[in-house]
Amino acid sequence: MTNVQDRTHDRNHLHRRAFLAATTGALALAGSRTSFAQNQSPDASVPMGRPAMPNNVKVDRLDGSILLIGIRQESDRVELSSVIGLGRLLYLLDHDETLRVGVLYSQGPDFVGGILDGASWAPVLRTGRFPETPEFINPVGTVPPHRQKPLVVAVQGKCQGAGHELFLAADVRVAASDTVFAQGEVTRGHFPAGGATIAFVREAGWGNAMRYMLTGDNWSADEAYRLGLVQYVTPPGQQLDRAIEVARKIAVAAPLGIRATLDSARRALSEGQEAAFAALLPELARLAQSDDHQEYFRALEQKRAPAFRGR
């Protein structure tokens, strides 16, 4: 039995390594690129190899360490294949050691209209269960495994329904001033099942979240900023550049410190603040022994920027 388990483990390990190697190798073809405005065309789309990406998902690598994920919705309907493709890219972000942060944006005039495509989602709506998918991280974060690396999102136009829940799952959020938000599932005979009943309430407060979820009313980028849902509001067309600016700052910071910061905050949400408090000093002691911590002092002494390696 042990030999069978070992062989299964080896096959799974090789399968994951092959997936990462194929996808990362394709990403490397993009090289290092400079920031691009949203109305400009970046380098040609990078073929993803295995697994195949939906036609409406575009991926590029920026500066070697930033994963750019561009989605294009041809209609307000969200197909299951698009969600699975995005989830596999988030898995890549977490498991490729050279990637430090992701940026999610839209290639079209709208982010995501957010109505689930009835045909492709029929099995999920019938069984109440998401299909088991290998090398996948749920984009809205409602089931484990959860994303471990930072994600910045840039939105414009419609950011509604499932699109708003995808937006809420990001760590830092940028919106163009023309963004129209909505969480109006109650007007279509169901409810926000992609995490908004938890994340929207947590981010904006009970009354603010319920005011929009129970009525289905739209709200603006300025209102989203007032509610604390958005960290930056930009003129239309500048939201992606701002998101990349934020991502670049994250990418040069110490990866171990970034991970510990996210872990601590998430532990407080999932396990309570006492558990998060208890883990603070042990985690600090662990990071104090890291090479990145020593690199900070070396860089300080040598009067240069630190080059953190995540070790």
Where are each of the predicted segments found?
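Conserved CoA-thioester-binding segment of acyl-CoA-metabolizing enzymes
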Residues: 38-105, 109
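N-terminal export leaders
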Residues: 14-26
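Crotonase-fold acyl-CoA enzyme core
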Residues: 49, 143-256, 295-298
